[in-house]
Amino acid sequence: MITKEQKAQIVAKYGANKKDTGNIFVQIAILTAEIEDLKPHFLANPKDNHSRRGFIAKITKRRILLQHLKKENFELYNKVLAELNLRK
């Protein structure tokens, strides 16, 4: 789980201002940070299927946001992929 401070840093880095949490770039960046934070847990606990459900939900939400961004603003989509080191 990422802390409030980490989330605030992400919002400050990718948002227009420090309260711009609705920006799609910020939402994708926060979900990516949460996903990266949970990966070691599933490597250590491969049978934790209850938590895996929430993990997959985060991945799905990020994928849906990326699909929407690709349809609406392809240049920003490519920027998001490059800055967050995501592959598509």
UniProtKB/Swiss-Prot annotation:
InterPro entries: Ribosomal_uS15, Ribosomal_uS15_bac-type, uS15_NS1_RNA-bd_sf
Coiled-coil boundaries: none
Annotated Gene Ontology cellular component terms: cytosolic small ribosomal subunit
First and last residue of the signal peptide: none
Keywords in alphabetical order: Ribonucleoprotein, Ribosomal protein, RNA-binding, rRNA-binding
Keyword Ribosomal protein listed: yes
GO biological process: translation
Subunit-level organization: Part of the 30S ribosomal subunit. Forms a bridge to the 50S subunit in the 70S ribosome, contacting the 23S rRNA.
Function per UniProt: One of the primary rRNA binding proteins, it binds directly to 16S rRNA where it helps nucleate assembly of the platform of the 30S subunit by binding and bridging several RNA helices of the 16S rRNA. Forms an intersubunit bridge (bridge B4) with the 23S rRNA of the 50S subunit in the ribosome.
The family this protein is said to belong to: Belongs to the universal ribosomal protein uS15 family.
Family matches, as NCBIfam families: S15_bact
Protein name: Small ribosomal subunit protein uS15
Source organism per UniProt: Mycoplasmopsis agalactiae (strain NCTC 10123 / CIP 59.7 / PG2) (Mycoplasma agalactiae)
